[in-house]
Amino acid sequence: MEHDNGVTNFHFEVSADIFDEEELELIGKMRPGLIQLEIGVQSTNPDTIREIHRHMDLVKLKQAVDRVYDYRNTHQHLDLIAGLPYENYESFMHSFDDVYRMRPDQLQMGFLKVLKGSYMEEQVAAYDLRYRGIPPYEVLSTKWLPYSDVIRLKGVEDMVEVYYNSGQFPATMKLLERKFARPAEIFTSLAEYYEENGLTGISHSRLARYEILYKFLEEKEENSGQSAPAAETTEGDEQKTGVENTAGDEQKIGVETAETMEKPTLSDFRDSLMYDLYVRENIKSRPSFAGDQSPYKKEVREFFMAEEENPRWLTDYAGFDSRQMAKMAHLEHMEDGTFVLFDYKKRDPLSGNARAVRFVYDPNENRMTKVEEWLLYTGRNFLN
C-alpha cells in the first residue's frame, strides 16, 4: 500500500472463506476503493455445492463478508449461478435470500454456461441440460429448472440490476426489506409488475424508475391483504431436487424478519424515494409524488441565510451567498416533519452519495436543530 498512487484500483476474484486474520486486517487498512472483491458463492444448496465439486465454508464466508462490510472501504460483489444441478427455482431463491442478507454491494446473478470440454458438458444427459449452441452457451433448462423458470429468473435479474446493484435506491431498499416477507419476494414482485404493465424491454430514465417503483408501491398498498407469496415450493420439489435447501438455516443473517418489524407506509416510501433521488444528485426535475415544498420556503431561506452569516453545516461553501448555497446544496422537507440537508461537496468515498444531515425546525429558537448525520447506504455517520 506504500506504492498506492491514490488512483489505480484493483479487482480480485477471491474465496472469502479462506481469508485469515492478517489478510482481513490488511483490507481494513486500505484506501476506500483501492480494491474490489468478487466472491463466487454460486449456491448455498449443499447438494449443489457437493455435485459441482466445490469446497466452501459458508459460515466462514459470511463472517469474512461481514467483517469487510464493516470496514466500508471495499466493494464486495457476490455471485450466484442459476442452472446448477439439484437447484430448482425455489432452491435458487433460497440461495438468493442467503446471499442478499450478507449485504453485498452488488448481487450478481449469472446463468450456467455449458462450455465445450467442461464437466457440465460431460453431464448434459444426466442433468437433462438444454443450452444455446452459440456463445455464451447459456443454459435454457435443466432437469430441475424448466425454461419458464429460467425466464422468470431473467426478470428477477433485471430488477436486481436496476433497484439493487445500481446503488440508487439505498433507503428505499431498506424499507422494502421490511415490507416483504423475504428479499427474493421484492424482486419477483417487481419483475411481475414490469411484465404485467408492459414495462420490460424499454429504456427507462432514472426518474422513470422512481415513478414506476412508486406506482408499484401504490398498487401494493391498495391491494394489501390480498397478495400471495411470489414464489412457493410446489408439491414434489423436494423429490426433484433431492434436498430441502437448508444451507443457510444455521447461518441466517442476524437481522429482524419482515414479520417482526413495523411495516412502512406509503408516506415512508415517498420520503425514502426523495432521499434516494437527492442523495445522488441535486435533481432539477421532481417526480410526480414529490411533496410540495412551498409551505417551507421561510424555513429553508432562513437556514441558508444563517449559513451565510455563520457557517455551521456548510463550511465548504465560503464565499457563496445564501441564494447560491441554496442552489448548490438542497434542503428537503420530508413528510415525517423533518428536513434533510444534502451537501454535495462532501460525498462518501465508496458509494459517491452526498453527505446527509437530518434536522427538525425549532419554532421557539427559530432555527434548525440537528437530529442525525448519516448515510443510510452505509448505516453509519460517514464524517466519523
Regions found by a protein language model. Name each.
Residues 13-14, 18, 22, 56-63, ...:
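Generic recognition of stable, solvent-exposed alpha-helical segments in well-folded globular domains
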Residues 22-31, 58-64, 87-90, 120-130, ...:
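Short secondary-structure transition/capping segments
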Residues 8-13, 38-44, 68-73, 106-116, ...:
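Short, surface-exposed, charge-dense and proline/glycine-enriched linear segments
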Residues 1-85:
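Conserved SAM/AdoMet-binding glycine-rich loop
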Residues 47-52, 84-91, 103-188:
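Flexible glycine/acidic-rich beta-alpha junction loops that bind and position SAM and/or redox cofactors
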Residues 7, 148, 354-356:
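Sequence-level motif detector for i,i+2 pairs with an aromatic at +2
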Residues 98:
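Phosphate/diphosphate-binding loops
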Residues 158-384:
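Radical SAM enzyme core and accessory elements
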